[in-house]
């Protein structure tokens, strides 16, 4: 088995199976999650003979294939997995926190019209250790503890719930990040929101809405053809009832597509009446598509309408624009080179 993303109990059972005393499990746990070891051969508290014997045993760490740094100190990583596939992770520093944006899949099958990742197709789900590794890699590179993790990188997390939930538990219990500092973002899939809710996680849950009516959403998100907006909102209301946690709606503003005053009023009607918050995200243009970012006047007007309708709303801007750091962009640009 791969050791990363395993609990203290699982690691203790493993060392005992290898003929080692149980206390080695606690040592292994510490070296994996606190010291960030990449090889069992580097665990100095282990007997030299066993270290040499187990030197090639898979821990589950990946290699940094490419790294770029933006003027705002955002760092974008391409990580090479054990099978040679490439995924993205982003480290986003601010004054009092370090946030990591992680991928949950290699590529993405959702094929959203405005997304660079979707243009590259889908290969496979990530394993839990490949998700946790992204966080540890960024933490080591910054030499600073990660405070927040957002599942907003490559892939649709709700198509990989077992591995994502395992990673969530590991990041919480083993890496030491509070569940409320962990965010899962989804475009929404039938039955999957309730399935996630039943895990009773105290995470932040975000839905990539991006449209205020069915017609526009189906154009932007092909899967919306099979999942009506009205049903998505009902599932979000049920999520709030089950978990007691609010839903955050992510809304990318696309000039002339979903940023008109009538869209703002439609959006307000959708999200009022239950615990929710709207994040407005001005679009980060990519070469593959023709969508554009609205001007600041249009962004402010959209936000003002929501505020007048008593909707909790925040405008959030993408970090790392100078280094293709919005989701999917760096991988697509580097793979073309």
From Swiss-Prot:
Q: Which reaction does it catalyse?
A: adenosine(2503) in 23S rRNA + 2 reduced [2Fe-2S]-[ferredoxin] + 2 S-adenosyl-L-methionine = 2-methyladenosine(2503) in 23S rRNA + 5'-deoxyadenosine + L-methionine + 2 oxidized [2Fe-2S]-[ferredoxin] + S-adenosyl-L-homocysteine; adenosine(37) in tRNA + 2 reduced [2Fe-2S]-[ferredoxin] + 2 S-adenosyl-L-methionine = 2-methyladenosine(37) in tRNA + 5'-deoxyadenosine + L-methionine + 2 oxidized [2Fe-2S]-[ferredoxin] + S-adenosyl-L-homocysteine
**GO MF entry, a single one:** tRNA binding
- Name the enzyme's class: transferase
Sorted keywords for this record are: 4Fe-4S, Cytoplasm, Disulfide bond, Iron, Iron-sulfur, Metal-binding, Methyltransferase, rRNA processing, S-adenosyl-L-methionine, Transferase, tRNA processing
Q: What is its main location?
A: cytoplasm
> Some GO term, biological process aspect, for this entry: which one?
tRNA methylation
Q: How is the cofactor bound?
A: Binds 1 [4Fe-4S] cluster. The cluster is coordinated with 3 cysteines and an exchangeable S-adenosyl-L-methionine.
- CDD domains (UniProt xref): Radical_SAM
Q: Where found, per UniProt?
A: Cytoplasm
Q: Which cofactor does it need?
A: [4Fe-4S] cluster
Entries under Gene3D superfamilies matching the protein: 1.10.150.530, Aldolase class I
Disulfide feature: 101-327
The entry marks the following residues as binding [4Fe-4S] cluster, namely 108, 112, 115
Please name the catalytic residues of this protein. 88 (proton acceptor), 327 (s-methylcysteine intermediate)
Q: Which family is this protein grouped under?
A: Belongs to the radical SAM superfamily. RlmN family.
Q: What does this protein do?
A: Specifically methylates position 2 of adenine 2503 in 23S rRNA and position 2 of adenine 37 in tRNAs.
- State the name under which the record lists this protein: Probable dual-specificity RNA methyltransferase RlmN
Which organism is this entry from?
Answer: Microcystis aeruginosa (strain NIES-843 / IAM M-2473)
């Amino acid at each position: 088995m791969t050791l990363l993303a395993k609990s203290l109990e699982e690691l203790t059972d493993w060392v005992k199976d290898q003929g080692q005393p149980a206390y080695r499990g606690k040592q292994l746990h510490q070296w994996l999650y606190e010291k960030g070891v990449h090889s069992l051969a580097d665990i100095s508290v282990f007997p030299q003979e066993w270290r040499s014997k187990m030197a090639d045993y898979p821990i589950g760490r990946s290699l940094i294939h490419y790294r770029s740094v933006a003027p705002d100190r955002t760092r974008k990583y391409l990580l090479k997995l054990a099978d040679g596939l490439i995924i993205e992770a982003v480290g986003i520093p601010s004054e009092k926190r370090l946030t990591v944006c992680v991928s949950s899949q290699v590529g993405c099958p959702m094929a959203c019209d405005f997304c660079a990742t979707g243009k590259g197709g889908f290969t496979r789900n990530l394993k839990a250790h490949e998700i946790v590794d992204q966080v540890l890699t960024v933490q080591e590179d910054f030499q600073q503890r990660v405070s927040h993790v957002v599942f907003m990188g490559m892939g649709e997390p709700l198509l990989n719930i077992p591995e994502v939930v395992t990673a969530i538990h590991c990041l919480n219990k083993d890496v030491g990040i509070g569940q409320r500092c962990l965010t899962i973002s989804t475009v929404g899939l039938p039955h999957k929101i309730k399935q996630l809710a039943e895990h009773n996680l105290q995470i932040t849950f975000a839905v990539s809405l991006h449209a205020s009516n069915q017609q526009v959403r189906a154009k932007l998100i092909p899967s919306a053809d099979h999942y009506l907006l009205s049903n998505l909102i009902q599932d979000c209301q049920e999520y709030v009832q089950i978990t007691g946690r609010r839903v955050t709606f992510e809304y990318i503003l696309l000039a002339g597509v979903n940023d008109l005053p009538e869209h703002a009023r439609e959006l307000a009607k959708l999200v009022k009446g239950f615990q929710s918050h709207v994040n407005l995200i001005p679009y980060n243009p990519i070469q593959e598509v023709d969508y554009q970012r609205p001007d600041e006047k249009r962004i402010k007007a959209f936000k003002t309408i929501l505020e007048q309708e008593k909707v909790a709303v925040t405008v959030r801007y993408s970090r790392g624009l100078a280094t293709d750091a919005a989701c999917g962009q760096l991988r697509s640009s580097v793979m073309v080179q």
